[in-house]
Design a protein with these regions (language model features):
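C-terminal beta-sandwich interaction modules and adjacent acidic
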Residues: 1-342
Length: 342
């Protein structure tokens, strides 16, 4: 293919350079796009050392400024290494992407290919507060080329001028086949009333694009003499941080109130539309975000949930405000995700 853009990083000593044709790699649930790139090597500066490239999936949980006190805030989940120079063994046939990159870097180019395991998490981060410095908590992927005597010798100190790296993203789209949406219902009796208020809420499908309107269908049967004054719809993001501890918490990403009066012994059937947007939640610390906005984790049957690093799901709550002041109702559904690729 003709390359519209090449991502390139050169080491400080200019002995090696890393080339990629893209930085977003799609997780199709059953498989993941291969990571195919090229390393340009100038052997004159190697001094008998070798050139390696690695792809690492890491979980970070802290700020960079804390590293100065000797604490490690990065945990490698998965690492693969390939010796680039001198060339050893046989290599797979070049991909069209690698052929295009080799034309950019000439005779000193050496292709590499990584296959990302399907059970690894997607790139996601927890949004820091505006005043926070350094990296937030999250999962990222790094491609790094380096010059060393051995691939991974803890006693060998590798100088920064002998390395070059690029951060890439593993992203996930919704499956093309989308299931029917969830439905929840509840009834509640109030004091001084022998009949209940019935609430039913549903959505048409279980997955939505970020930025898409979400129609919430609401049915109310008020058998009491009390008046339903207001309907409140809330969308919550639930995040599970699985790697360093069992940590689960929720953030509200949308709250909207609708002034609908349902008098005693009457009914209402109506659709209310809500649109949760990341742009309305920029100040919220700890909100899970990714390249498209709000992320959602899609798990293949049999996949180890503990490998996902950060699990993200959503629920919608529908509450009725009744004249007595009591709150009624509840709808829980996993529904927001990237849309399918077209």
């Amino acid at each position: 293919p003709s390359l519209c853009r090449v991502y390139k990083k050169t080491s400080g000593n200019e002995s090696i350079a890393l080339y990629l044709g893209k930085r977003d790699f799609v997780d199709h649930v059953e498989s993941v796009d291969i990571v195919d790139g090229v390393i340009k090597v100038d052997p004159a500066e190697l001094e008998g050392r070798k050139v390696w490239v690695y792809l690492a999936c890491a979980f970070r949980y802290g700020s960079d400024d804390l590293d100065v006190i000797g604490l490690s805030f990065r945990k490698d989940i998965w690492v693969k290494r390939i010796q680039i120079y001198p060339v050893v063994g046989t290599r797979p046939a070049n991909t069209p992407m690698q052929e295009a990159l080799l034309k950019k870097c000439g005779d000193q180019g050496h292709p590499f290919t990584f296959t990302i395991d399907t059970n690894l998490p997607c790139s996601v981060g927890l949004q820091p507060a505006p005043e926070d410095a350094g990296k937030s908590c999250g999962v990222d992927y790094e491609v790094k080329a380096y010059i060393a005597k051995e691939a991974d010798d803890p006693d060998e100190k590798i100088s920064k001028k002998d390395t070059c790296r690029l951060i890439i993203r593993k992203i996930q789209f919704a499956p093309g086949k989308v299931g029917a949406g969830p439905k929840a219902d509840i009834s509640k009796n109030f004091m001084m009333s022998d009949k209940p208020v019935h609430l039913e809420a549903s959505i048409e499908k279980e997955l939505y694009f970020h930025g898409d309107p979400i129609p919430v269908n609401v049915k109310i049967n008020n058998e009491t003499t009390k008046v339903v004054k207001k309907i409140k719809i809330t969308v919550e993001q639930t995040t599970e941080v699985l790697l360093y501890q069992s940590d689960k918490y929720s953030k509200t990403v949308l709250t909207e109130e609708f002034a609908e009066e349902i008098k005693g012994e009457s009914t209402l059937e109506k659709t209310f539309t809500v649109i949760p947007l990341l742009s309305n939640n920029k100040e919220k610390r700890g909100l899970a975000v990714d390249v498209s906005g709000f992320p959602k984790t899609y798990i293949r049957p049999g996949m180890d949930k503990g490998m996902q690093g950060i699990m993200v799901s959503y629920k919608i709550k529908v509450n009725l405000l009744v004249s007595s002041g009591g709150l009624l109702g509840g709808l829980t559904a996993s529904m927001i995700m990237h849309g399918p690729m077209s």
